[in-house]
Amino acid sequence: MHDIGKITEGFQNNIKKGKRSNKHPHPLYALPIIKNIEFDYLFDIPIEVFAILSHHTQLYNNLYADYQQYKKGTFLIEEIKEFIKNSKEAYESLGFSKFFEFEDLKIEDIPKDAKPLELHRLRRKYWIEANNYIKSLSFDDKIKIKSIFSFMFSILQLCDDFASLNFSEYAKDREGIFDDVLENPEIYVPTLNIDNPISFILKDYEPYKFQKELYNSKNKFVMLFAPCGRGKTEGALLWALNALKNFKRNKIILAMPTQVTSNAMYDRLVKIFGEENVGLFHGKSFIKLRDSKEIEDEDDLEEIRDENFKGNVFFKPITITTIDHVIYSFVHGFSQADFALGNIQNSVIIFDEVHYYEKYTLEHLLTLFDILRRMDIPHLLMSGTLPNFLMNNLEGYELVVDEEGLNYKPFKLKCSENHLIWKEDDEWKVNENIINEIIENYKKGLSQAIILNTVERAREFYKAVRDKVPAILYHSQFAYKDRVKKEDEIFTLEEMRKSQNKPYVIVATQVIEISLDMSVDVMYSELSPPDALGQRAGRLHRKGKDWRENGKEYKLKIFLPYKHLPYSKELIEKTINHIKFYEKPLDYRDIKDFVDNVYKDYNLSIPSDLKLFFDEAILFGRHWTDISTIDEEGRFFKVRDDKFMKIEVVPQVYFDELGENSLRAEYMAKIPAYLILNEMKNEEGLIHFYPYEKRVGRKTRRYLICSFKYTYEIGFDYKEEEEFEDIL
């Protein structure tokens, strides 16, 4: 029924001529026909009709409101009668009788024409009645409508997309009403069939006790508390594979904190499950997928676009994505959000490192978890510290704890009242004692990480150490392609450490906390809140059991930061007041205790405004471009706090070298917005930035070229303003 609006003279003529039918909106043309057919709808509003209306453009308040642009459609009445008459036969021949009962369709009258003004009035009537009905419902009933509508819509969209894909070839030299277009329907709903998940995931390793508990769990909602490097991901996959069977689902979604962690998890799971079973989506996933394959021609690029689309809507049995994409699925945050949310209804979700997020995002996540529970969507929350302020806001979850791993003390914490780097007379000074210590440690074969809280301090410390020992600098303000290359370089250094005992030195910002699978012997870090310190420590003596092992002493050496930013002054002061009680060999229970003491009075505002935007988008709401950009940078609704807002720029050095080819996403870098805002205030105007416009199709896209010195080694070399010192 969804395409019955195509049975008009104009639309059929355009098909025969190979012309587009933008002025003949067949989903809207279907409305006056469907209105006259007797249906037993699921609810008091016809969500089935809204699925038909939106199967080419996602529902929003003003969908089809610009009716003046459309042409009148003249219905082919006899063909429509024949189509409706054959509905019972189609129902039986396609095997739908196994799933639901259906009687012949009865239509009262078939109109002669679909007139734009009449269509507009009819559409407006449906919208008003549906909105009034939704407003009268409780939140749980709204969730029920959203859940069932999106699930139904995803089935329609899936069938329509693949039928359209196969239709051109099928329809050659054929006339009249067609039979079913798709064969082998099982390929359109791919599933995982793994007989022995434990041996499949763990190979020859014996599962830890907590991994067995996860595998045997029959609960839909689970929290896991386990240290870094203890096999949380493997345990989560065991839970998820069993949950697919226990709760009759067919997809696993892993929601990661960042694009970097998503890429790393994708590489990891492709090796386990195979490329055909694993999808990826985030704002720059197309680049990652493209770079993972050898591209020879346009057909290869089309295959990458198809893979990216499948990740976007959670099509494959396993999809790795960011928490941003999952959240935007619930608020019409991208063009296929309803399709994606429909697939989420049939999924189990794993959330990694849920304690990691700053307050603003964490409030959104806790609001999301409440919606997921009400939708009855199984999910697992993983954390290395699981602080009380988080646990106190989560009810109805089974708690699984890695008791064995929590007893290990993999490092010793030591705190100094000195700085690693500071300013005197507007010049940066570094702690020469630590520089010398790093040199001596390197000679002893020790790998080391030095973590600073701002990009500029990391840059300046790196400059001081790079001529003394081989070192690499890593932060978030590199162009995307350079950041990926740096990650590959760090991965190679880590492999050489493992295989050849070859040491390395990395200077980084707190981006290291979550993004890199690496392990050093000594870590120097500026003081940060205890949850951040715990994350950093996850890259120190990873998988270790005792701080004295292998003839080494593994130490986390903390230094006072030159400035409290990017953290609040109060939070840094609380951390300083408590850290003296933790100068000892630490296990992860100690770290949790440290976190709980510092955050004792930490209050989260729940629900966040995610609930308001979700409520607004039960069926309609805003157009997705009002919610988010195509790269999932928030507009009206933001997943991340823009307190430290960044802008995307193209380094001048790449623009000079590559011209317009440098305007591709992989050459862009994110830098603090205040850099351009401050220059806009100057009398001379912009000094280091200028706009560049490029025509893309019918639109003109504007880019910013940045002339600050940029190199692969350092990134942008600019001076930060202390009141805006930038995170990451």
From Swiss-Prot:
SUPFAM superfamilies from the UniProt entry: P-loop containing nucleoside triphosphate hydrolases
Keyword Acyltransferase: no
Organism: Methanocaldococcus jannaschii (strain ATCC 43067 / DSM 2661 / JAL-1 / JCM 10045 / NBRC 100440)
SMART domains: DEXDc, HELICc
GO CC annotation, single: cytosol
Function: CRISPR (clustered regularly interspaced short palindromic repeat), is an adaptive immune system that provides protection against mobile genetic elements (viruses, transposable elements and conjugative plasmids). CRISPR clusters contain sequences complementary to antecedent mobile elements and target invading nucleic acids. CRISPR clusters are transcribed and processed into CRISPR RNA (crRNA). Cas3 plus Cascade participate in CRISPR interference, the third stage of CRISPR immunity.
Pfam families: Cas3-like_C_2 (PF22590), DEAD (PF00270)
Keyword Nucleotide-binding attached: yes
PROSITE patterns: HD_CAS3, HELICASE_ATP_BIND_1, HELICASE_CTER
Gene: cas3
Name assigned to this protein: Putative CRISPR-associated nuclease/helicase Cas3
Domain Helicase ATP-binding: start-end pairs: 213-404
Span of domain Helicase C-terminal: 434-592
Cofactors: Mg(2+)
Binding annotation for Mg(2+): D3, H55
Gene3D superfamilies assigned to the protein according to its UniProt record, in alphabetical order: 1.10.3210.30, P-loop containing nucleotide triphosphate hydrolases
Family annotation (InterPro entries): Cas3-like_dom, CRISPR-assoc_Cas3_HD, CRISPR-assoc_Cas3_HD_sf, DEAD/DEAH_box_helicase_dom, DEAD_box_RNA_helicase, Helicase_ATP-bd, Helicase_C-like, Helicase_Cas3_CRISPR-ass_core
